């Protein structure tokens, strides 16, 4: 048996069994898995890297299950695939890479990126993931059109990173509580909703302009690689966010219905030519894909306080970090090495305390079982803050649905002309996305 290739895959709860002491023969390859949402759950230790069987990875860009499926559109951010698979290779996961694709058509670019990285990771690293995507678009549509399309696709991936089209109904799958089957408000204020709708509207318009200028022989390729994924995602957001506004008397229900009809029309167009029967906009017939039920609410929309200062990880004035190209809510998240510091500066503060909201990538520990950081203001004492999650906990579900892990704290602040906020990573694997400063609002 030692000569027969064998693989052990500690998927989901099986990883807990492995961590509890399960012994695997040395010649068996250990196949590490992501959490189904793009974040690898375990990286091999030095002992595991030395095993005869080596290490592999089983990675998802499509998933059926809790907290919610994403089977329709290929929206896993290429920068996340790049960041996680680069880290996997650096950590000794080099024997075998397996990609769970689901429906291959919506995810053609991510599949190509994954395979190119598996074949020659250094070549992809040298050009960067943005350049890789641009070359993909140039090959299909020519240089000039690729120059115009790449920012469109990058923005489409960024918006879907914040929340996937399939997650826009604030519903869940495979939950016992029936409330998760009912479309409900996302925790967004009116301004956030309108800004997101405007961003998608702008993308959709740009895609439509290119469509009309395309030669006939390129229209089918363009429709399934660009027009359908961007405009269908835009209409999904339009359908559900307009409905959220309409529930509070802030929009017309007819706009939500028209968005649903647009998705139906786009999908029909997809399935009437070369790619007939390849696209289904209602995988598993989940509630989020239906026309939204008209239901008025007496309560108002969520109101959020305005942050006084906001920074992306890359906005630090001092410190050593690695920018994760394109990753994060604004594409400027940074990987912070263990014990390294990032410094952010702000002006005089009006009160004697400040609420600090730290937003991080919801990834898993790289070494050991912890993900921790500290925050220090003007040299104040620090306290370790943990944000790793366990299994399929409620916090983990919330994290993967919104692609951030959030921690809040209130710190005392002195009356002075300027201040220095220092973020320190205590463990490997810390990726800082954003920091927000508010007037205190938590107890």
Predicted regions and their residues:
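Active-site clefts of carbohydrate-active enzymes
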Residues: 52-76
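Beta-sheet entry/capping signal
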Residues: 3-7, 27-30, 54-56, 93-97, ...
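Gly/Pro-rich turn-and-neighbor structural signature
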Residues: 1-52, 194-221, 236
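C-terminal non-catalytic alpha-helical accessory regions
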Residues: 133-287
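Aromatic- and carboxylate-enriched substrate-binding clefts and catalytic-loop regions
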Residues: 5-40, 47, 73, 95-149, ...
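Extracytoplasmic
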Residues: 283-443
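Catalytic-core region of carbohydrate-active enzymes that cleave or remodel glycosidic bonds
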Residues: 72-99, 116-121, 254-264
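Short alpha-helical segments and helix-capping/turn motifs at coil-helix boundaries
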Residues: 12-18, 38-43, 79-84, 341, ...
């Amino acid at each position: 048996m030692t000569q027969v290739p064998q693989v052990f895959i500690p998927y989901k709860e099986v990883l807990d069994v492995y961590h509890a002491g399960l012994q695997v023969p040395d010649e068996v390859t250990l196949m590490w898995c992501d959490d189904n949402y793009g974040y690898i759950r375990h990286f091999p230790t030095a002992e595991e890297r030395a095993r005869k069987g080596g290490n592999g990875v089983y990675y998802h860009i499509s998933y059926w299950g809790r907290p919610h499926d994403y089977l329709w559109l290929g929206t896993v951010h290429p920068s996340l695939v790049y960041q996680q698979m680069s880290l996997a290779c650096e950590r000794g996961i080099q024997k075998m890479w397996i990609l769970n694709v689901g429906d291959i058509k919506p995810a053609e670019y991510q599949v190509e990126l994954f395979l190119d990285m598996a074949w020659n990771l250094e070549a992809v690293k040298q050009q960067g993931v943005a350049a890789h995507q641009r070359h993909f678009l140039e090959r299909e549509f020519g240089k000039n059109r690729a120059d115009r399309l790449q920012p469109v696709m990058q923005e489409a991936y960024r918006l879907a990173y914040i929340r996937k089209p399939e997650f826009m109904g604030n519903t869940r799958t495979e939950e016992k509580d029936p409330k998760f089957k009912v479309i409900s408000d996302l925790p967004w204020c009116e301004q956030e909703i309108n800004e997101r709708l405007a961003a998608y509207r702008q993308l959709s318009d740009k895609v439509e302009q290119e469509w009309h200028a395309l030669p006939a022989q390129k229209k089918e390729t363009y429709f399934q690689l660009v027009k359908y994924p961007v405009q269908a995602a835009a209409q999904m957001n339009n359908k559900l966010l307009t409905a959220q506004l309409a529930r509070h008397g802030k929009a017309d229900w007819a706009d939500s219905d028209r968005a649903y009809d647009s998705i139906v029309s786009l999908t029909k167009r997809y399935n009437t030519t070369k790619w007939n029967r390849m696209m289904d906009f209602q995988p598993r017939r989940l509630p989020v894909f239906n026309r939204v039920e008209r239901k008025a609410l007496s309560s108002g929309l969520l109101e959020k306080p305005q942050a006084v200062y906001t920074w992306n990880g890359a906005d630090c004035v001092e410190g050593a970090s690695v920018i994760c190209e394109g990753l994060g809510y604004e594409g400027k998240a940074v990987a912070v090495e263990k014990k390294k510091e990032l410094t952010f500066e702000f002006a005089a503060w009006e009160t004697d305390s400040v609420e600090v909201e730290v937003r991080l990538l919801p990834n898993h520990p790289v070494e050991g079982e912890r993900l921790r950081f500290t925050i220090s203001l003007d040299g104040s004492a620090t306290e370790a803050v943990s944000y790793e999650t366990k299994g399929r906990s409620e916090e983990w579900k919330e994290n993967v649905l919104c692609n951030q892990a959030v921690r809040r704290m209130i710190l005392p602040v002195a009356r002075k002309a300027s201040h220095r906020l220092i973020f320190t990573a205590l463990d490997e694997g810390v990726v800082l996305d954003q920091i927000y400063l508010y007037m205190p609002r938590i107890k």
